[in-house]
Regions:
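N-terminal Sec-pathway targeting helices
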Residues: 1-15
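Activation corresponds to long, low-complexity, non-globular regions
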Residues: 41-74
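Membrane-interface motif at the C-terminal end of an N-terminal transmembrane signal
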Residues: 19-42
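Solvent-exposed serine/threonine-rich low-complexity stretches and specific carbohydrate-binding patches
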Residues: 147-161
């Protein structure tokens, strides 16, 4: 009998080891997928017509069923290994092909030049070009036969606010549906001078993502803000950014080289976005990639932002280093030159050398073997001080570093002061004022200046995950209140927060100025303040995002689906880019 028990126990041990190994393998695969480059561009073609050999661009017609003529242009090498649309030379050839078609002339609202996704950076965008006999704007409305999908109306951003040349990317077509599109030419007096309706059958999404999300109404009766939510870093949809309207309908599927966008920065009628693990691109309003910034040995990690004039700053990993996710780099937007601004393992070396690599039985087991001792996840540049404020998930600390272009030095740190006691860095900790629990595992920290505050005071807004875990300093055990989560997955008794700190650099203090509760998410997530006062909050582990009113009450929440989590969801009206 004893022998049978021992054999049974041995079998259980083996099974546990197999399960653990399987979990580690799957987790490693998903995490690795974040950095992988797209190995193919799945494109359904129409009827082949000819190849422009001079620029090696293939021409097709009717790649989709439509009541108007729709063209398709593809680089001749699009099926070759290593091909990418995020190549300036490829984009210039496509632009030349498009210009050749435009030069034929004679395009009208009723017979426009229509090209499906001409630059390959989206799956359901329709490029339209035509001229009118009078100055106007083009307003369009998209409907489907599915009565549960509301109509979508927008004013297209053409070359001029009111002009006779109409050229734009039509955003809003629903994947997997026959779409009815009504174009209206509207003059300065608001009169509709002409209109035209056509139909177009759009294919299913390239990613396989559903064309709608489940929406749940909150208690607030406040109005939703205008714009599109854009979801980035859904764990089994790396290489895509999804744009949803206020009803949860997918209105645009952006195709990347890999990775995720992190955020979208507006630059007039262009945007900047991360498009690969080591690429940032500048993209025009019609989807053309105008410039690609190759980061060389650096891999992006979860945030980039504006630097001083003509510069971007980004969080990164130096792939030639033994550590990960602890570098701050700058990118010159004119030359593309990449400069290391801060190596945090050098800046904080006395603490860094006391840390260790992540183990397979730690909270962040999917990073086993990596030296992720700081795990930076958001950055904001403060130009007047040549400083940055960064968020460190691993230490649950917000860090301000000054003189980043000259001699970087720590200015202050905000978090649980006990964490830094005895490390030699306690001198930088600002003092917590008031009875509240400081942030743990925070993301998306933003500095907010307020003219009503005296000099030296400002607010910090953040998504406080309210989750404690540290996998690289195993000798430290914090004293935590029961309100702080330690479960990686959902815990019904724990909530996360949107926190506002009032920072007083003069007094060396911080206090909680305001907060509101949001669904618990141990990792990832973000909180964005919109111009009208509403908030967009993404809780990435339960995979929900919502819009909240100015008092922190939920207006509407959306459920998405991902194998692990969704990194960030933001919202923009994209006026000046896609829309007027």
């Amino acid at each position: 009998m004893k022998k049978k028990i021992l054999v049974g126990a041995a079998i259980l041990v083996v099974l546990a080891a197999v399960i653990l190994t399987g979990v580690l393998v799957v987790s490693k695969y998903l995490v690795g997928g974040e950095k992988r480059t797209r190995d193919k561009w799945e494109i359904e073609t129409g009827t082949y017509t000819f190849t422009d050999d001079e620029i090696n661009v293939q021409m097709y017609r009717q790649p989709v069923e439509a009541s108007i003529q729709v063209a398709q242009i593809l680089p001749g090498e699009y099926e070759q290994e290593g091909f990418t649309y995020y190549d300036e030379e490829v984009q210039q050839r496509l632009a030349q092909s498009l210009m050749t078609m435009m030069d034929r002339g004679g395009f009208t609202m009723e017979e426009p030049l229509a090209v499906l996704n001409p630059f390959g950076t989206g799956s359901n965008g329709l490029y339209l070009y035509f001229t009118t006999d009078y100055n106007c704007q083009i307003r369009y409305t998209v409907t489907t036969d599915d009565e549960t999908i509301p109509a979508y109306t927008a004013t297209a951003n053409s070359a001029q606010e009111y002009g006779k040349v109409q050229e734009f990317l039509l955003i809003g077509l629903v994947a997997g549906q026959e779409n009815q599109v009504t174009l209206e030419a509207v003059n300065k007096q608001g009169e509709v001078k002409d209109s035209f309706t056509f139909t177009i059958q759009m294919p299913a999404t390239t990613s396989g993502h559903a064309n709608r999300l489940e929406a749940t109404e909150g208690e607030s009766t406040a109005e939703m803000s205008e714009g599109l939510f854009y979801a980035m870093g859904l764990s089994d949809y790396y290489g895509y950014t999804f744009f949803f309207d206020n009803d949860g309908i997918l209105r645009y599927e952006m195709l990347l080289d890999g990775y995720h966008s992190d955020r979208i920065l507006s630059l007039g009628d262009q945007i900047l976005a991360c498009v690969g693990s080591n690429k940032i691109a500048r993209i025009s309003r019609i989807g053309q990639v105008l410039q690609v910034y190759d980061l060389g040995r650096f891999e992006l990690h979860h945030d980039f932002n504006w630097g001083p004039d003509g510069e971007l700053v980004a969080l990164a990993t130096n792939t030639e280093s033994e550590t990960v996710e602890d570098q701050l780099i700058a990118i010159d937007m004119d030359t593309g030159e990449v400069t290391l601004l801060v190596d945090f393992s050098a800046l904080m070396n006395d603490y860094f050398v006391t840390t260790e690599k992540v183990s397979a039985n730690s909270s962040f087991f999917w990073q086993a073997g990596l030296w992720d001792w700081l795990h930076l996840n958001s950055v904001q540049y403060l130009e007047e001080e040549d400083a940055v404020v960064v968020s460190s998930r691993e230490s649950s600390t917000i860090i301000k570093v000054k003189n980043v272009h000259e001699e970087p030095a720590i200015d202050w740190m905000i978090g649980d002061e006990a964490f830094w006691e005895g490390t030699g860095y306690e001198q930088y900790s600002l003092t917590k004022e008031g009875d509240f629990t400081p942030q743990y595992g925070q993301h998306d920290v933003t500095v907010i200046y307020d003219d009503s505050l005296p000099e030296g005071q400002y607010y910090l807004r953040m998504f406080d995950n309210n989750y404690w875990a540290n996998s690289t300093r195993t000798g430290y055990t914090p004293s935590l209140p029961d309100s702080v989560g330690q479960a990686l997955t959902e815990d019904a008794s724990i909530v996360s927060h949107v926190y506002y700190y009032l920072v007083d650099e003069n007094a060396g203090t911080f206090r909680l100025a305001w907060s509101f509760d949001v669904p618990y998410s141990s990792v990832v997530s973000n909180a964005q303040l919109l111009e009208g006062g509403n908030y967009v909050v993404n809780s990435g582990v339960p995979q929900v995002y919502g819009e909240y009113d100015s008092a922190g009450n939920l207006i509407r929440q959306f459920q998405y689906h991902s194998m692990m989590n969704g990194y960030r969801v933001m919202k923009d009206d994209f006026v000046g880019y896609w829309f007027r």
